[in-house]
Amino acid sequence: MLPAECSRRLVAELRDALDSCAERQRQLEQSLRVSRRLLRVWEPAETPAPEPTPGSEINKEAPSSACPPSPQDLKELELLTQALEKAVRVRKGLSKAGEGVKARSLKSGSASTATKASAPPSTSRCTGSRAPETKPPRGVHHPWVPAKDLPGHRLLLVGDGAHMGQGAGANKPEAGLRDQQIVPQAASQVPEAFTLKDKGALLRLPEAFRKAASRNARLPMCASSLWAQLSSMQTRDSVDAAAATAKTQFLQKMQTAAGLPSSMLSAAEVGRLQKACSMLRLRMREELTADPKDWTQEYRSLLTLEGLQALAGQCLHRLQELQELRSAVVEQPQGPWPEGPPRAALPCGGGADPVWSPQLLLYSSTQELQTLAALRLRVAMLDQQVHLEKVLMAELLPLLSEQEPLGRPWLALCRAAHCLLCEGGQRFLTVLQDEPADRLSPP
């Protein structure tokens, strides 16, 4: 049996391992849910059916829930129906009477036209002789004279002055009906007002006016094209500025996500600093060992030493910045900064040291990516097993060293320790205890 303190420590370590495994399993399940949600077939969300309003439900239920009509309502409905039928009959009678009057007026008008055509041309009763005028054929259209220029505000045909006096006594009703028919027709054919905006294209302007009009018409087009070019240039400049800003922000976000500061430490800069330091050291040694012959050489030597001192101060300042940068990177949880120079390029597909530059994960197929994920999980599991093995070694080896190597309990303890430490609990060793040779020999 293990001591109580040792058992508690081992149980605590095992519980921590189980908790970490459960947390890892939860993260994997969440990642799987997100991946399935992204890879499933996208379907547009169905539009929800409009919910019926309470008013419509009331209207639908009203006929079914309405009470039967009373006898008084039925009587009023019958009276209303009779009144409507009577109104329809009266309206039909009026329409028939109007059609008869219209037919009689048309017949009388045709008869008067025939008599006018058969009668010889007669002169007008007005003073002054006029040439006989013949009535134009029926298909010819007569221009209308505005009614405001004639007495009585009537619209008359041009050239019908000779026939104004005929049939005045006998055909007065027919003439009245004809006047009533002519007035609406003339009113509908009143000439439209002439506007320069609608019909100005029919005018023939002088040559100078036409040239000026065409030149003025081209100016707005040129101005609009210039404005379009200016707006396109401004839009292009704004798009370029927005793209540059977005690129800078993206690089800053990538550097922040990778855990690297903006002023990254590069191997080339370290090499340049080392070369500058070695050259400064050599030059300083040459100037100090030189023996000036006169005050001019001594003055030049002092100026050279002053310049070398300024360069050395700049190099020291840069080295201090790099040291601060290194300490800041080491304190971050992403991993320590490399202490030595950059190593050779690793065959991992990234093309550079994964510590000195961001490592790129390259894969050629989904199967290779799946294999990489499985190997990553396997490495995490092996790291956890190694940690548990170290804890078991720290707890069990002192117990083995304290007990004497005698008897079966010690052999069972060794077997259990070997199984837990060396085989990972997968296989148990079988220990055989042989009897001495003299006991097995016959007497």
From Swiss-Prot:
Keywords: Cell projection, Coiled coil, Cytoplasm, Cytoskeleton. It holds the Pfam family DUF4693. It is found in: Cell projection, Cilium; Cytoplasm, Cytoskeleton, Microtubule organizing center, Centrosome, Centriole. GO terms for cellular component: centriole; cilium; cytoplasm. Residues 8-33 form a coiled coil. GO terms for biological process: positive regulation of smoothened signaling pathway. Interacts with TEDC1. Found in a complex with TEDC1, TEDC2, TUBE1 and TUBD1. Acts as a positive regulator of ciliary hedgehog signaling. Required for centriole stability. This is Tubulin epsilon and delta complex protein 2. It comes from Bos taurus. The gene is TEDC2.
